[in-house]
Amino acid sequence: MTETDIATSKPWFSTSSCSSKSEKLAEAENRIFTALGIKFSSELVQIPFKNTEINTITVNCENESSELKSKYPIVLIHGFGAGVALWGSAIKRLAQFQNVYAIDLPGFGRSSRTKFSTDPETAEKEMIEAIEQWRVKMNLEKMNLVGHSFGGYLSTSYALKYPKRIENLILADPWGFTDVDPSFLEKLTKRQKALFWVILKFNPLAALRLVGGYGPSLMKRLRPDLEQKYSEDVYDYIYLANSGNPTGEIIFKSLSENLRWAKNPMSKRFHELDKTVPVKFIHGGMSWVDWKTTREMFGSMDHVESHIIEGAGHHVYADDTDRFVELVIGSLKDGKTGDLVPEEVNLEEDIVTPL
């Protein structure tokens, strides 16, 4: 039986083993937030779309003196293979200024492993409708929507359909904006090409599931740097968040072209976004994402800003949390531009070392 067969026939909570994993995931999530001193509430918000439950974290702003132009909450949407807990200390810092919600997308983390359409265009629409139904259920008039990577792609797709529900659109190193680079494979060695084609035959995180209980140890060996940003529980969290029915991976794979690009990139439709929606791109100077092309395509638009955080990689919110929060809150503070500190990266002098 293939992973696709599993994804279409067996729900995440169908066995006691899976239920145990879901409980352990909730515990790991709780430990990460607790270690960071974050006071949060958690609930599974049920929406009409296939009775999907969306894991929702709420952190209320306790700073009564916070004065922002925007009265609307910050909503965080994670990237591929991630979940609410990976926003980490960024949530704590953002909540000093505004109420914060973070959700696990359907098919990821502790949300339902919803089966989406096998048609990429339909599947994307279903995901956007799930986000909209969540907004309605939460009774949020508008949102300051912050999306990272794949979450940035989906946030933009949402803004294209529901611009009146967006106060600010903030894209943290978003995936899926540029066209396919045909020279990518040419730059790989024969061994890298062979490995690349093997990976494409499976769901992206299949290897993590295949090693079973060794998953956390494998993650620790591959990403020892994560322990510098989170507690050691992050390795259990990432493994458990991706050990369930991989419906989120399946939709990501269906929307992607060789995983690295989108089949329907935002380069073809970003210009359709309502010009009254302020957009801020926040890229990591050392990210693998082609931010230079993104900035060239969209950076000169009147309602768009482009910022590069030097020294940060793809996970800009974790690599330089202080600068990331300054840029996000800058949008809420005076509507479009503005930082909490006057320093700014000189975009003409960026030195980028791709990973």
From Swiss-Prot:
Origin species: Caenorhabditis elegans
GO molecular function annotation: carboxylic ester hydrolase activity; lysophosphatidic acid acyltransferase activity
One biological process term in Gene Ontology: lipid homeostasis
Pfam families the UniProt entry points to: Abhydrolase_1 (PF00561)
GO cellular component: lipid droplet; mitochondrion
UniProt-recorded name of the protein: Abhydrolase domain-containing protein abhd-5.1
Taxonomy, superkingdom: Eukaryota
Annotated ranges, domain AB hydrolase-1: 73-319
Family: Belongs to the peptidase S33 family. ABHD4/ABHD5 subfamily.
